[in-house]
């Protein structure tokens, strides 16, 4: 039940901010729930990277028809090792879902991911950062995003908590957008 509620909540979030975006860009593929949601929402191109080999292989098998069509682009490894190559596939404003915090591994790639987006020539993507404030200081994340474009505005969307996070944190996703 939690997974279906979580998937519904995520689909509502992506649908709300899809606007005219045709490209969905994700760090942290996990089981491919967001990739499937992006396909269901009819994004023309879905780009995702996963650091865990088992999850990557699961998703590669699951989405092979879309990979063959060039609609889904999956990468295996650390997002920061692939960001520049992945961003070459982005030729228009896109919806970014930054959820690349690996299970059981210290550190988080968010700062480097945002730096790569900052160096990309397009400066008006919609960026959603998962799990604020579980992993980050929201003001620091906002400041980093404003380095990309000082016109970004921010909204905090209520996220459906899973597992033990429900008892510890009120969990939010940070949405940065250009009005």
Give the label of every model feature segment.
Residues 1-95, 101-179:
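A short alpha-helical cap/connector motif
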């Amino acid at each position: 039940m939690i997974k279906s509620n979580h998937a519904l909540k995520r689909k509502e979030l992506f649908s709300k901010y899809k606007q005219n975006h045709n490209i969905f860009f994700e760090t942290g593929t996990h089981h491919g729930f967001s990739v499937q949601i992006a396909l269901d929402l009819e994004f023309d191109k879905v780009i995702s990277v996963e650091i865990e080999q088992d999850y990557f292989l699961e998703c590669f098998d699951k989405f092979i028809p879309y990979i063959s069509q060039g609609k889904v682009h999956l990468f295996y490894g650390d997002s920061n090792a692939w960001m520049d190559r992945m961003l070459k596939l982005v030729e228009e404003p896109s919806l970014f879902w930054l959820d690349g915090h690996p299970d059981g591994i210290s550190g988080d790639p968010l700062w480097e991911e945002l730096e790569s987006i900052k160096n990309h020539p397009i400066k008006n993507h919609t960026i959603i950062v998962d799990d604020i404030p579980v992993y980050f200081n929201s003001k620091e994340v906002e400041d980093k995003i404003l380095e990309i474009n000082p016109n970004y505005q921010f909204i905090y969307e209520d996220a459906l908590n899973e597992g033990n996070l429900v008892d510890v944190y009120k969990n939010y996703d940070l949405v940065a957008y250009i009005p």
